[in-house]
Amino acid sequence: MKRSLRRVLRPEERKEVQGVVYRGVGEDMDCSKESFKVDIEGDMCRLEAFIKNRRKLSKYEDENLCLLHHAAAEGQVELMQLIINGSSCEALNVMDDYGNTPLHWAAEKNQVESVKFLLSQGANPNLRNRNMMAPLHIAVQGMYNEVIKVLTEHKATNINLEGENGNTALMSTCAKDNSEALQILLEKGAKLCKSNKWGDYPVHQAAFSGAKRCMELILAYGEKTGYSREAHINFVNHKKASPLHLAVQSGDLDMIKMCLDSGAHIDMMENAKCMALHFAATQGATDIVKLMISSYTGSSDIVNAVDGNQETLLHRASLFDHHDLADYLISVGADINSTDSEGRSPLILATASASWNIVNLLLSKGAKVDIKDHLGRNFLHLTVQQPYGLRNLRPEFLQMQHIKELVMDEDNDGCTPLHYACRQGAPVSVNNLLRFNVSVHSKSKDKKSPLHFAASYGRINTCQRLLQDISDTRLLNEGDLHGMTPLHLAAKNGHDKVVQLLLKKGALFLSDHNGWTALHHASMGGYTQTMKVILDTNLKCTDRLDEEGNTALHFAAREGHAKAVAMLLSYNADILLNKKQASFLHIALHNKRKEVVLTTIRSKRWDECLQVFTHDSPSNRCPIMEMVEYLPECMKVLLDFCMIPSTEDKSCQDYHIEYNFKYLQCPLSMTKKVTPTQDVIYEPLTILNVMVQHNRIELLNHPVCREYLLMKWCAYGFRAHMMNLGSYCLGLIPMTLLVVKIQPGMAFNSTGIINETISTHEERINTLNSFPLKICMILVFLSSIFGYCKEVVQIFQQKRNYFLDYNNALEWVIYTTSMIFVLPLFLDIPAYMQWQCGAIAIFFYWMNFLLYLQRFENCGIFIVMLEVIFKTLLRSTGVFIFLLLAFGLSFYVLLNFQDAFSTPLLSLIQTFSMMLGDINYRDAFLEPLFRNELAYPVLTFGQLIAFTMFVPIVLMNLLIGLAVGDIAEVQKHASLKRIAMQVELHTNLEKKLPFWYLRKVDQRSTIVYPNRPRHGRMLRFFHYFLSMQETRQEAPNIDTCLEMEILKQKYRLKDLTSLLEKQHELIKLIIQKMEIISETEDEDNHCSFQDRFKKERLEQMHSKWNFVLNAVKTKTHCSISHPDI
């Protein structure tokens, strides 16, 4: 369009407009869109100046409008002619941001001349905007009949074009009741048989909109096209709904009468098996029901017709309390005792929905009161649950004998109306029922009395009324089918006020069939207020056991109620083991109840809780070990408590931290028992070994554990390891001296004579050095003998585990080869065997020396890294082997004239050497090429290029990448590996060291001064290279200010809650004294905040009571609505 405007405004293409004067452009302030008005009076230059004025057009750029849209909307035909002259047809159909063309704008503004002009110029009338509206649909919506006529007369207009939701212009005409437009469309060939996406025809739309004139035209035109009025008026949509159904939904009595006069079938049912009569009955449209019933000429009983739920018209009227309609239906013969698919009569349905006018009407008409639904409930069961209960019935009905007999009638669960009233918490209904001398001892099939229901749901006022006139405590202490008394049920659901009332009335602390007391139930739910009421009444009940030996502490810990556990501990509840040898702390740990464990740790009775366990239990071990396995974060908190900082300033020289180690190891008296009891093995450093077993690196790195290991290391670990290292050096150093001082390849003995082996001449050892060499040989021999003895002892100690450690096999190789190397002291052996064993021995001696250095932190980490990288190399051996075979054999075929590749074995070895970078390109490839010795030069060099790419580049980089990744992984877990070795070392040492020595050096705690040096200069220098590094640790701040403030706010809220409850009780007493009737008098719902979750969980359980609760709480209002057409 913009290109068309530019063509219009070009000087060479400008056309003269005769007799027209352009007078400028003004803004129409009355128009909501501030559209332009352009008056053309002949001055073409001023028109050009207006179009070039971008400032005035800028405010329409958001909608992407052009001048032609506004000209069409204003009916400026001359300006439109000027704009489109010289333009293409595309300019006529240009769209704004909403998909509207100039023709849409003209139709919307009822500009007939603009529509005519645009159509004459070739505008497309069938284009639809974003709302699927064509210009014809817009004209129909605006009831612009002239525009409709112009559009329909145009040959290109599709009269049956579908718009929004599949509606044609004919459907929209019926919705507007525009009979003139309908006549125009029908004459131009609009189809009456075309439906929208819901299957509605124009006759449906006319019926729903109450368009009587359009309905008449549609039926008349249908007769002309071969459809009778009766057949046409009974067309159905996708839901099988006829026009009569839609007319009833709209509530237009005249339209309904017109449908009936045209032959609409009253008994026609839609998909939900509902007649139009059921819709009318639901709405309470008495006049419509009367009209339809009086118009029905069929043979069936239309008054008692049922829908898909087997509900009659009277059921529908009863559900929504349509009193007049129900009275009329009864008068014309409606069955007042018919039942629906759930066995509900109109009386039961009206009672469930609190339609009291209908209830009283049905009772006055003699409705049967003994009819029960499929749950066995009569209307009285439902009446007592409603607000004001029996007060809603007329007094004369309550005097009827057959109604009085219903008070003891039971449903399928054996519950009487009194059970229902007590469960719902309706004190007024309870009072009314008790006036009929109803027995409060009546039981349901699960042996529950009304008091059980009232106590279970916290109905305090109901409980007070039931217990008001009792003379004994039999009702209080009766158990149900599971042996649960009202006290059990009230405690189970956390109703502390009910529990207090029952205890005051004489309820006993009995156990149910599972051995659970009221305290067990309250602790399982975590109801601390209820527990406090019980404990204040009977303190000894804390130690009552159920059939499995569980106390209330076990229940609270299993469910994770930390506050309940804290309360029971504060009331000095005994810490006992159940039949599975588990204390409450074991149960909390196994179920990962973090808050319970933390609460127990902070308790004053923590040490007592820790000591309750059996040493021979396989699944319930020491709680510290269980804590490390299941809840390491709690163990961290416990270790934090073992760090006790001093009160001095942290920068002071006297500032110190005391580290307590009592939770990290069993007492020495238990680990060093001469005769183990009950086959229990007490190992040293038990807790640290469990940490290593479960990879608890965060615990092993805790300051307390580090100080504990440092204490062990300084006490005996460092000395023992240095002694072990020194004894190993007694064989390593002499062996090294022998290898260095003696020329390889010569056989020697104790006399210093050298036998000729490889050399062709004889040589002699310097006689001055023969004695030192003899001493070295003896030391190597003795160290090997000592090593043999040590390994044999280890075999008996470690048994099968000895053979699983590859270090032991390495030491056997060292001692054997070194002994063979020095065996010429006693025997003559060949020199080649002697020196081969010597090479093996010296190699493994120094390699094993690296493993000894793993114990030291600074150098041990690098040795661990070397070990892991070597394992990575072994994992990639498969790739090496195949590449070695591939290239080695290939080079053997191509280069077998060279000595290095003359045999397959030598070729493989040379290829392995080339893998390390020793390719020897000049001697092996280049010079043979110049001497024409290569039989296949192209293939040979191609193989060399492939080898270079695969091995030195790709494979080596792959190994480097794996090594780097493994190094990062080792660095991540290096601390765990190092500490694991330290723990293993100290564990093995403590097993071997005597008890008197351990008792002397072992410490229960240690005090560290962070601001003072811990060792002398020489010792610090030595520790820097070999020993564990010291890192300064800060003692954690356990009690933060934020926690204290939250605790203060918590107690303040409790005080406010208590004050409000007292004021509430006082106001209730004032109301009773002044005899004020309150709307809340009938409410009996005292649900505290702490038991709200428990109540919601009970309501979510599947029960037959759910239907009753839903019917009482909400009134279902079925709104019959029809989709927009």
Swiss-Prot record:
Alphabetically ordered keywords of this record: ANK repeat, Calcium, Calcium channel, Calcium transport, Cell membrane, Coiled coil, Disulfide bond, Glycoprotein, Hydroxylation, Ion channel, Ion transport, Membrane, Metal-binding, Oxidation, Repeat, Sensory transduction, Transmembrane, Transmembrane helix, Transport
Q: Where is this site: Key residue for activation by the scorpion wasabi receptor toxin?
A: P623
Residue ranges annotated as coiled coil are 1044-1073
Site annotation Essential for electrophile activation. Sensor for electrophilic agents: residues:
C622
Which amino acids does the record list as binding Ca(2+)? E791, Q794, N808, E811
Chain positions recorded as a 1,2-diacyl-sn-glycero-3-phospho-(1D-myo-inositol) binding sites: K1048, Q1049, K1050, Y1051, R1052, L1053, K1054
Q: Name one GO molecular function term.
A: metal ion binding
GO cellular component entries: apical plasma membrane; axon; plasma membrane; stereocilium bundle
- Residues crossing the lipid bilayer are 722-742, 768-788, 807-827, 833-853, 877-897, 938-959
Topology of this chain in the membrane: Multi-pass membrane protein
Please list the GO biological process terms of this entry: calcium ion transmembrane import into cytosol; calcium ion transmembrane transport; calcium ion transport; cell surface receptor signaling pathway; cellular response to caffeine; cellular response to carbon dioxide; cellular response to cold; cellular response to food
Residues involved in (E)-cinnamaldehyde binding: C415, C422, C622, C642, C666, K712
Q: Which residues lie within the membrane without crossing it?
A: 905-925
Positions carrying 4-hydroxyproline are: P395
Report the locations given in the UniProt record.
Cell membrane
Enumerate the catalysed reactions.
Answer: Ca(2+)(in) = Ca(2+)(out); Mg(2+)(in) = Mg(2+)(out); Na(+)(in) = Na(+)(out); K(+)(in) = K(+)(out)
Instruction: Name the tissues where it is expressed.
Output: Specifically expressed in a subset of nociceptive neurons. Expressed in dorsal root ganglia.
UniProt site (Crucial for calcium permeation): D918
Give start and end residues of every ANK repeat. Answer: 63-94, 98-127, 131-161, 165-194, 198-227, 239-268, 272-301, 309-338, 342-371, 413-442, 446-475, 482-511, 514-543, 548-577
| Result after altering D918E | Ca(2+) permeability is greatly increased
Domain remark text:
C-terminal helices from the four subunits associate to form atypical coiled coil structure; this region is probably involved in binding the inositol polyphosphates that are required for optimal channel activity (in vitro). The ANK repeat domain consists of a convex stem structure followed by a crescent-shaped structure that surrounds the protein core.
- Role summary: Ligand-activated Ca(2+)-permeable, nonselective cation channel. Involved in pain detection and possibly also in cold perception, oxygen concentration perception, cough, itch, and inner ear function. Has a relatively high Ca(2+) selectivity, with a preference for divalent over monovalent cations (Ca(2+) > Ba(2+) > Mg(2+) > NH4(+) > Li(+) > K(+)), the influx of cation into the cytoplasm, leads to membrane depolarization. Has a central role in the pain response to endogenous inflammatory mediators, such as bradykinin and to a diverse array of irritants.
Q: What is this protein called?
A: Transient receptor potential cation channel subfamily A member 1
Q: What is the lineage of its organism?
A: Eukaryota, Metazoa, Chordata, Craniata, Vertebrata
